[in-house]
Amino acid sequence: MRVLFFAHLKDATNCNSVELAVAQPLGSEQLWEALLGRFPALADHRASVRLACNQEYADPQMLFNPDDEVALIPPVSGG
């Protein structure tokens, strides 16, 4: 599973993306546990981050498959 980081999340993780070795689908809670185990600094951002899977926003009950591309989307504003 490839996980992408954007904006200040890149700073928190010191990388643009990471490959997670997973053998079976993960729920969002399991995914967060795996990410926080590797990048504890993400804990400060969790409440404001949306998950996206294969370029579409994910709902909280979604399962993420081993071959998915997951993105952590920080708050976005525009004008």
Q: Where do the PLM segments sit?
A:
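Ubiquitin-like/PB1-type beta-grasp interaction modules and other compact soluble beta-rich domains
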Residues: 1-78
